[in-house]
A protein has these predicted regions:
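Binding-site signature for planar aromatic cofactors or substrates
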Residues: 1-130
């Protein structure tokens, strides 16, 4: 999940998939969003966001500063950002909450022909590498 700030200071959550995020190294990520989306507009305006990664026992909040990149020639509708990791907060169930686990979560179901879906995801990953 990606949380950006709208112009009024309210958090705006958005779902992102693994295909839209590419780790460049330990401190930099590349993010691809639909160019006309609210999250891309918010990130361009504020330059800050928080990525949330959660599994059964751990939740990580990755605070990032984002810089808009030029569009990829192969993906004109894609807004690309380079994200620099500013801080990482880890959250585990401890104390009275010890043993509590996230039992289920958000799952993206890529519908359609599997070959077409794989091609689309590969295209997106390639555009992030440009």
């Amino acid at each position: 999940m990606l949380a950006t700030l709208d112009p009024y200071g309210w958090p705006h959550p958005a779902l992102v998939s693994y295909a839209e995020i590419l780790a460049l190294d330990a401190a930099r990520l590349r993010l691809g969003l639909h160019a006309g989306s609210r999250p891309s507009r918010h990130l361009r305006e504020s330059g800050r966001a928080t990525l949330v990664f959660a599994d059964g026992e751990l939740c990580c909040y990755v605070k990032v500063e984002g810089l808009a990149l030029p569009g990829a020639p192969s993906a004109p509708g894609l807004a690309r950002f380079e994200l620099v990791v500013h801080d990482v907060l880890e959250d585990r169930a401890e104390g009275e909450e010890a043993g509590a686990r996230l039992a289920s979560g958000l799952t993206i179901d890529w519908r359609g022909d599997p070959a077409a879906v794989a091609g689309r995801l590969a295209w997106l990953r390639a555009a992030l590498r440009e």
